């Protein structure tokens, strides 16, 4: 059974909704999932997890949130080599179907750090995740559990 830390930052609650759906899917898929806001995760427990799902909504000009999430992610980035990592987040700045540059950049950043990025891409949702987007997040979590 994989032990997965799901760590997120959410300014509006939309990425938190995604995180909760992913945790539900992970548990259905047979993983042991722990959910943390980025400020509540103890970096000292990093090595006790097999896999990580990181969530951050797009901020500014299609980038990771800079005051809480970016410093956290920078602090653990050097430890991602060989780790199975899933990425997710919501966006609002671009129109539906037009966003995602921050996720593409984040995926490439994780790959450059040596992470095994799940499915080679992140799970994104526009604005407040619809029922369809929430179902997609649950399925994403279930697949990541395997």
Swiss-Prot record:
Any Pfam family matching the protein: Flavodoxin_1
UniProt-listed InterPro entries: Flav_short (IPR010087), Flavodoxin/NO_synth (IPR008254), Flavodoxin_CS (IPR001226), Flavoprotein-like_sf (IPR029039)
Molecular function per GO: electron transfer activity; FMN binding
Record Gene3D superfamilies: 3.40.50.360
Entry cofactors: FMN
Keywords, in A-Z order: Electron transport, Flavoprotein, FMN, Transport
Keyword Ribosomal protein recorded: no
Flavodoxin-like domain segment(s): 4-145
TM region(s), chain numbering: none
Electron transport as UniProt keyword: yes
Family: Belongs to the flavodoxin family.
Function: Low-potential electron donor to a number of redox enzymes.
NCBIfam families: flav_short
Name listed for the protein in its UniProt record: Flavodoxin
Lineage of producing organism: Bacteria, Pseudomonadati, Spirochaetota, Spirochaetia, Spirochaetales
